[in-house]
């Protein structure tokens, strides 16, 4: 209510808002995480050497995880649960927008730890709001924090990646694409595109650019674009699309291919084939999530193999780019790093490992 009175951006308000449905979703996530298998102490691999040495690769906690995040109060709960379940301590620095909500969630979590005779400091919350705290976390905590996870807008993530002197797990932007091939099921293409863009426009898995094969029937293109327009989506299209479409569309510029709108807006472009679609995605995308809609298995396989993103999809919505939806039981974020972890970082990705080497007196020659 206060945010609306102060005329704060509607997308930010949507992320801050906690209604009964969102609280129910948070509770459901907690329950799901408690049911997941303990990821610590798992034998990931084992083998025996010719000299009799027995080697095991065993999962262990990372250690202390620092998290700097904005807006979404559910992140406080997700991160606390996932870090604790994976045997890690977590230091939370939430945004000022949700300060009091975050504080209450952490208080409840720490109270629960104490009631179960567990060290409350597994979950810590930084209550100071000044920006010097963030700089200190990034520059001065190398001996205390093992990995940093930023959750928020491009500027926050960029700052963390530039200033932090410990490994960072995260992504700058979610410029996600959906490519419609020439042979598709019309109803499926229409439903998937609408969901990928409009289900929730403010999440990083929302499709921001729609690519369409040049031989896709004009009738199908008009049907799909009209579905978006009828749902109040503003379309920025290249000249080829504007000639095909029966109504009026905004003209796209080269800048639109690099935009993460996080709004009811989408850029649309005609491409020659699946190869050009892949080239466009690898040039303008952010290695987050990209999907192909096609009945052609050869094109689908080519797309999946050659798109460089951490999540590639076939005949489904990019909005499934979420740890909970992929069965991870929640996530601390999505990593677009080329080194692991990649994609949704859930419980099983919040671990490191060590090698246990057992012998019976062997010495190296």
Predicted feature locations:
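Rossmann-like NAD(P) dinucleotide-binding subdomain of oxidoreductase/dehydrogenase enzymes
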Residues: 35, 43-183, 187
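Conserved C-terminal structural/oligomerization subdomain of aldehyde/semialdehyde dehydrogenase
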Residues: 253-365
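N-terminal Rossmann-like NAD(P)+-binding subdomain of aldehyde/semialdehyde dehydrogenases
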Residues: 1-55
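General structural feature for long, well-ordered alpha-helical segments within catalytic domains
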Residues: 22, 26-29, 61, 101, ...
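ALDH superfamily catalytic-core signature
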Residues: 71-74, 78-89, 108, 115, ...
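Structural motif
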Residues: 63-67, 82, 88-90, 121-124, ...
């Amino acid at each position: 209510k206060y945010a609306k009175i102060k005329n704060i951006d509607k997308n930010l308000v949507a992320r801050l808002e906690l209604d009964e449905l969102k609280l129910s979703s948070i509770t459901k996530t907690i329950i799901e995480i408690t049911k997941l298998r303990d990821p610590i102490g798992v034998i990931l691999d084992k083998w025996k050497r010719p000299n009799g040495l027995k080697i095991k690769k065993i999962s262990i906690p990372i250690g202390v995880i620092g998290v700097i995040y904005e807006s979404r109060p559910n992140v406080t709960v997700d991160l606390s649960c996932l870090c604790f379940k994976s045997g890690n301590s977590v230091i939370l620095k939430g945004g000022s927008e949700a300060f009091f909500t975050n504080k209450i969630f952490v208080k409840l979590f720490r109270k629960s730890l104490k009631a179960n005779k567990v060290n409350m400091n597994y979950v810590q919350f930084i209550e100071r709001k000044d920006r010097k705290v963030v700089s200190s976390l990034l520059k001065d905590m190398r001996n205390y924090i093992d990995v940093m996870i930023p959750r928020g807008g491009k500027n926050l993530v960029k700052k963390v990646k530039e200033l932090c002197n410990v490994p960072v797990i995260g992504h700058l932007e979610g410029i996600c694409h959906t490519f419609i091939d020439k042979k598709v099921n019309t109803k499926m293409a229409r439903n998937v595109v609408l969901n990928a863009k409009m289900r929730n426009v403010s999440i990083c898995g929302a499709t921001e650019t729609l690519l369409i094969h040049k031989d896709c029937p004009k009738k199908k293109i008009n049907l799909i674009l009209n579905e978006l327009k009828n749902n109040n989506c503003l379309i920025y299209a290249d000249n080829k699309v504007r000639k095909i479409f029966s109504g009026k569309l905004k003209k796209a510029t080269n800048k639109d291919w690099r935009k993460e709108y996080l709004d009811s807006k989408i850029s649309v472009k005609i491409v020659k084939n699946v190869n050009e679609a892949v080239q466009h995605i690898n040039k303008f995308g952010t290695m987050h999530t990209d999907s192909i809609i096609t009945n052609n298995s050869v094109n689908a396989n080519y797309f999946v193999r050659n798109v460089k993103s951490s999540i590639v999809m076939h005949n489904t919505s990019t909005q499934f780019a979420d740890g909970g939806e992929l069965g991870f039981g929640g996530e601390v974020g999505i990593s677009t790093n080329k080194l692991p972890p990649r994609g949704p970082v859930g419980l099983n990705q919040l671990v490191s490992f060590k090698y246990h080497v057992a012998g019976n007196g062997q010495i190296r020659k």
